[in-house]
Structure formats: C-alpha cells, structure tokens
C-alpha cells in the first residue's frame, strides 16, 4: 500500500494531495498543470515536499515532521519517464542490465527472461535504442525499471510522446504488466482513454488538489480520446 499525504508550494501553485494506492494501477488523472508529475517526483524522491509524509507498505520514505527523507536510490521505486531515457550507446540488453546493477541486485537469468517475455522484447536485445520504435523504447524502459526490483512502479505519461499507432502497440503490455507483474503502479495521464484501459483506481487532480478518488466512473464526464 502506498500512502501519500503531501503539500508543496510550486510557484503560484499550492499542491496539497492525499491518497492511498493499493495493488493494481492507480491513475493520477487531470489537466496539464494539475500537479501530477510533481506528485510522482515526490514519491520518487526527486522533489521534496514542504510538509507531509509518504510510505510504502508501512516503510516511511518521507516524513517532514520526523526529519525522514530516504534518498531516491534507496526507495526501491521504478520510474518510467515520458521519453524512456535509454542510454543510446548501450544495447537493449545492456540498458536492461543497467537497472539491475544500479539496484545492486545479483544477476538472475530467470527473472531477466521473465521480464523480457512479459514485455515481448527478446528479439530486440542486441539492438541500440535508435533502431527501436517509440513503443519498443518504452517497453525497454519499463523492463529496465522492473529489473531494479521495485516495490512500486511510477509511469509518468509514458505514451505522451507516441502517435496513436504506437500507443495501441504498447497499451496491451501495460495491461499485462498491471495484471501479471504483481507490483503496484501509479500511472500519470491526462488522457481518459488511456486511463480507462489501464487503471483500477482513479485519483483526479485539478489545480494542485485531489478533487475525487474512486473507480473508473470518475472518468464519465471526461473527454475520451480515441484509441480503440
């Protein structure tokens, strides 16, 4: 269980968000500028809240009152950014192994093979990122994050830079990840169609505040972009 209760002044925006996220995929949904990326950056330890606390499965990652602020590399949180951020000079195999090495985990061929199969990237292992499609790059980025052995996976608008065809390509893998990986996911998006496909819980944000939390019915009044 992820428990978030944070406040942060970001220029003119006062961010104040409180929510819990259990197994499955929790979507942070709202318009651009609502504070979604700032929230996941605080969970990852890349942005420090002014007040509040963040905990995963009872382990405190941040608590302003108690002076606790666990460094990002010790939080065991996987992060997939909009553009993937693969190393261009490394092969797909080497990019994947980078995630494992950065976490200090031993090499386990069975885990590597399981994640490669889950994301269907075995045929890409010897390629460089420049030889991949946008959807393939994002699948590799997800694989690298999983090989860090995270207890939580953050995905910050991972489809935002992709055209509709590549969004359709990667969406089934994200659904499979949600159902088969056994790792809670926090998925950031302002696109209702994506959230409907992936999320099990929705947290709606607007102007830095949580306005509602619940099921997919919270998307009923949202504009739906066509992905079907």
Question: Where in the sequence are the language-model features?
Answer:
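Conserved ABC ATPase signature
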Residues: 128-132, 136-138
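Catalytic Walker B motif of ABC-type/P-loop ATPase nucleotide-binding domains
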Residues: 153-157
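Conserved ABC ATPase "signature" region
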Residues: 59-64, 107-124, 175-176
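Conserved H-loop
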Residues: 182-188
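ABC ATPase NBD coupling module
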Residues: 61-78, 102
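Helical segment within the ABC ATPase nucleotide-binding domain
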Residues: 168-181
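A short, proline-enriched helix->beta-strand linker immediately N-terminal to the Walker B motif
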Residues: 147-151
